[in-house]
Amino acid sequence: YRPENAFEKSVLTRLEKIPTDIYESVEEGANYIACEIAQTIREKQKAGRFCVLALPGGNSPSHVYSELIRMHKEEGLSFRNVIVFNMYEYYPLTADAINSNFNALKEMLLDHVDIDKQNIFTPDGTIAKDTIFEYCRLYEQRIESFGGIDIALLGIGRVGNIAFNEPGSRLNSTTRLILLDNASRNEASKIFGTIENTPISSITMGVSTILGAKKVYLLAWGENKAAMIKECVEGPISDTIPASYLQTHNNAHVAIDLSASMNLTRIQRPWLVTSCEWNDKLIRSAIVWLCQLTGKPILKLTNKDYNENGLSELLALFGSAYNVNIKIFNDLQHTITGWPGGKPNADDTYRPERAKPYPKRVVIFSPHPDDDVISMGGTLRRLVEQKHEVHVAYETSGNIAVGDEEVVRFMHFINGFNQL
């Protein structure tokens, strides 16, 4: 994922339509972007000019903001010449709303640096509906009055949105009021507590406004962003994935961690873009992919299938499709067992789990209550039936997954039921 030179990078990334850098961790990627922003701020300071930033709330940029705060406190990075435009705001909001995107932006960055409050601009989620059109037009004019945006920092939503430009947004769209779809509202409900309390719309910078920035950085961390990153970076430009519009920008960059990169061709199917150092895991991955692509079982794959789909290296390595097929078939067959904790008093040479010790003490880590029984209930049952000592470690209590209103309603039901 880290090419050693420009030639190797050009080979590995030839299917990627936006320059994309993959980092080992969120912190590493965020620190790089923070340094890029800091460098632009300092260059503008030396020239005696403002640096205009378009910034979002949300989780994706939070590590970038933390690094900028550190640089401000420890390295003297000043924000006195910085203009900040909030990218979007929920609508409608009450005047005392604490869940606004602007409040989140202040808590994550603005309250911790020396930026002049007069240099901070945000859409107003409390304005009257009949004034929104004119308000959005003036917001665009204000951006233009400062010479446009120098850096736009973006996250990518679950439906491929940038800011709140939902699927269907046009390339020439500007700041406007937009209805939020169910996916965006469900995501925002984590902030507002329940879907009922979540605003139904947002005032957002448009696609054209964002693409007008001199530099654009798109951040994505975690495997839940992997599918959208692939569509954005390698897919066609489409209004169904508004982030794909970044392919038209001549200075857009994508920064992602390894988890978010897992669907990119150079990570998921590297044999399509370069020669590979083949190991058992990569070979299995390639053969399973080839089966899915051709619709054939492993033992039916032919030399032609391998040659036509970028896997001729395996034919050279093993001599024929038959030899590869047999090896991978046997490898996969040996991962299937009715004894997940190991079969006692049996030859475990080709079994996925060793026979001894028996019984075993087993710890199963479950990201959330119920994930264990939903995803591997049969395995759990077998482990218990085969006399192993089984423990489940839940990595979260799951209490915030249920809204307060649901809890209260259920408590009323229980109280009423007990009185019957």
Regions found by a protein language model. Name each.
Residues E4-K17, L77-I151, E277:
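Ligand-binding beta-strand-loop-alpha-helix segment within the catalytic cores
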Residues G310-L420:
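Active-site rim/loop-helix segments in enzyme catalytic domains that contact anionic ligands
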Residues L55-S60, L154-R158, W221:
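Glycine-rich beta-strand-to-loop/alpha-helix junction loops that act as flexible
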Residues F7, S208, K214-L314:
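ATP/nucleoside-binding phosphotransfer catalytic cores, i.e., glycine-rich phosphate-binding loops
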Residues N81-E89, A220, H253-L258, H391-E395:
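Short internal beta-strands
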Residues A163-V207:
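Class I SAM-dependent methyltransferase SAM-binding "motif I" and its flanking Rossmann-like core
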